[in-house]
Amino acid sequence: MKKIALAGLAGMLLVSASVNAMSISGQAGKEYTNIGVGFGTETTGLALSGNWTHNDDDGDVAGVGLGLNLPLGPLMATVGGKGVYTNPNYGDEGYAAAVGGGLQWKIGNSFRLFGEYYYSPDSLSSGIQSYEEANAGARYTIMRPVSIEAGYRYLNLSGKDGNRDNAVADGPYVGVNASF
């Protein structure tokens, strides 16, 4: 029974991902960079995403997320979770299972506002006390498939066992996004 349920879930995910658009993005802040990829992140239904954030002083974070996009009038809400690998420069590498979501508001054909928040407490984290990620910004489509974006990203790995916190990202960024 478990194999059938797992095969059904995997099939739904693959069907949803193949129908919906793929997006690739890159952002650069003053002291960090972020690279991301997503399947179905701009349409209703299942969405799969992944990203890698790097900071020379505070370490690396890589994550894979699964969400469900739901229409709410002019907004699209996402609820879901992320599996995150953490490698802080000050502390032990580990993982976090974060839960959260986001909102997108498409204004016209070219402009979109967005925000998201994910959190993992100590009970769902290893090597860190907690994981916290927030991102908010605006995206303007220059010419499909290319858009530019600007926003603010905060990603913090709270220290554990006497290790200090590692703010992998904390500041404004600019970026580019391509959706196919």
Curated annotation (Swiss-Prot):
Coarse class of the primary localization is: membrane
What cellular component terms from Gene Ontology apply here? cell outer membrane
Q: Which domain of life is it from?
A: Bacteria
Q: Does the record carry Nucleotide-binding as a key word?
A: no
Q: Which UniProt keywords apply?
A: Cell outer membrane, Membrane, Signal
Query: Repeat as a keyword?
Result: no
Q: SUPFAM superfamilies in the record, alphabetically?
A: OMPA-like
Q: Which residues form the signal peptide?
A: 1-21
Q: Where in the cell is it found?
A: Cell outer membrane
A Pfam family matched by this chain, by name? Answer: YfaZ
Record protein name field: Outer membrane protein YfaZ
